[in-house]
Amino acid sequence: MIEKDFVTEGLKRTRIDEYLEKELERAGYGGMDVQITPLGTMVVVYAERPGMVIGRGGKNVRAITNTLKNDFGLDNPQIEVKEVSVPELNPKIMAYKIANMLQRGMHFRRVAYSTIRRIMGAGAQGVEVTISGKIRGSRSAVAKFVEGYIKKCGEPSIRLVEEGFATVQLKPGVLGIYVRIMPPETVLPDSVEILPPKMEIIEDDEVVEVEELDDSEEIVEEEIVEEVEDLDELEEIVEEESAEEAKEDS
C-alpha cells in the first residue's frame, strides 16, 4: 500500500536525522534534506562548521556515506555539506547551544533570555523557547519564554515556523529543550500590503491642446493691444486738427 510506503520512508528519514544529529553534534548540526535523483540519493547536510563534517581528507564524509549505504539502505548516497549562514535563525543549532550552556551549570532563565536576545537580534519575527524537566527541584516543571510574534496553531504554524529539539543529561535528570523560530522573511496569509497612491500622467495630446489654447489667447491679446494703439493715434490726429482749426479762426 502507498500509505505504508510513506510511513516507511518517513521512519527512514527520522532514523537518518537522529544518526546525523548524534554523529555531527560538535559540528553544529542544523538539519538535513534527502533528495532522490536518477544517479542515487543526495543527502544535503546543514552545519555551522562544515569543515568538521567533512573531516581531514574527507574521512568523516566517507564514513558517514558508508553508514548510510550499509545500515540505512540508501542507493548510492552522495553527501553535500552546506554552511548555515545565520546560525541564530536555525532552531536546531540554538537548541544544542542551550543544552551545552545548561550542561555547564548556567541558570536556565539566563540561558533562555540570552538565547532569545540573540535570535531576535538576527532579525527573527518571533521565538519561543521551552525547557522542561527537573529545572527547579525534584519535581518536573515546564518553563516557557516567548518574544515577538509567532504562530501557535493552524496550517501556518506548521509551514512557516521552524522547530528544533535537543536533550541534556543533568544530575537531577534529563531536560528537554524545544525552540520555535519564525524567520524574518515569513509572509503570513492574513498580511495586507498597502500600496502608495499612483500619480496621474498627463498625455501628450492634452498638453498640445493646452498649448494651442495659450497661443490663441496670446493672439487675441495682441489684437486688442493693436486696436487700442490705433484708437490712441486717432485721438491724437483729431486733437491736432481741432487745434489747427482754432488757430485759423483766430
Swiss-Prot record:
Gene Ontology molecular function terms on file: rRNA binding; structural constituent of ribosome
Keywords, ordered alphabetically = Ribonucleoprotein, Ribosomal protein, RNA-binding, rRNA-binding
The superkingdom of the source organism is Archaea
A Pfam family matched in the record: Ribosomal_S3_C
Q: Which PANTHER family match?
A: 30S/40S RIBOSOMAL PROTEIN S3, SMALL RIBOSOMAL SUBUNIT PROTEIN US3
User: What family does the entry list?
Assistant: Belongs to the universal ribosomal protein uS3 family.
Oligomer and partners: Part of the 30S ribosomal subunit.
Annotated function: Binds the lower part of the 30S subunit head.
Which NCBIfam families is this protein grouped with? PRK04191.1, uS3_euk_arch
What name does UniProt use for this protein? Answer: Small ribosomal subunit protein uS3
Source species of the chain: Methanobrevibacter smithii (strain ATCC 35061 / DSM 861 / OCM 144 / PS)
Classification from the root reads: Archaea, Methanobacteriati, Methanobacteriota, Methanomada group, Methanobacteria
What gene codes for this chain?
rps3
